[in-house]
């Protein structure tokens, strides 16, 4: 397991309009980075995994919406390096079984299961009067429970196992990848910029 990353794509492309709609015209205080920074970072993380000996990579994103851009990076990387890279957001793992959301029953239940100390359900009503805005909170947030979160996460783990089995592994002997070796993949990603889900200027 690689260290998790708390930064993600936001404030650009469709995210910008959505953010204004669900949060309002306030400082959203997000851990956002420009899309090219996140995507390029993923590319070089994939390089690091291969050089460390991994022959398959599962990329799991807790931020739904921009996974198409992460898959684009994975696709271009796989054209250079023969290892499977599977990219999914957490709602995609359980699509058709559990409906995803943003800061609602789906997401809060998962957090209640794994880190209940980070959730204060008494603060749900703040969305109606807090100066920080509406928090993009889903209306069903009050329905969140740790038990529901356990069901979601166990189903996600099962699906990750299935995807990993389906993906298989790459060849054991691969040459060391330099930074320059993967630059062609980044050039290809940039050439497809207008197809990025997060394409657009950084707001603010």
Label the predicted regions:
Residues 1-58, 62-204:
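Extended, histidine- and acidic-residue-enriched regions that form the cofactor-binding/catalytic faces
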């Amino acid at each position: 397991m690689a260290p998790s990353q708390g930064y993600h794509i936001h404030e650009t492309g469709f995210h910008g309009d959505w953010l204004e709609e669900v949060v309002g015209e306030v400082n959203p205080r997000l851990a956002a980075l420009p899309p090219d920074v996140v995507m390029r970072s993923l590319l070089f993380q994939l390089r690091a995994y291969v050089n460390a000996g991994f022959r398959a990579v599962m990329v799991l994103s807790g931020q739904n919406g921009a996974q198409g851009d992460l898959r684009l990076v994975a696709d271009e990387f796989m054209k250079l390096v023969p290892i499977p890279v599977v990219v999914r957001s957490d709602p995609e793992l359980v699509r058709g079984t559990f409906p995803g959301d943003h800061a609602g029953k789906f997401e809060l239940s998962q957090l209640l299961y794994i880190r209940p100390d980070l959730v204060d359900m008494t603060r749900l009503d703040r969305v109606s009067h807090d100066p920080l805005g509406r928090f993009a909170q889903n209306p069903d947030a009050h329905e969140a429970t740790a038990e529901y979160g356990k069901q979601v996460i166990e189903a996600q783990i099962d699906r990750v196992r299935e995807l990993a089995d389906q993906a298989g592994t790459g060849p054991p002997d691969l040459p060391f990848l330099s930074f320059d070796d993967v630059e062609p993949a980044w050039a290809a990603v940039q050439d497809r910029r207008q197809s990025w889900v997060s394409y657009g200027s950084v707001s603010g």
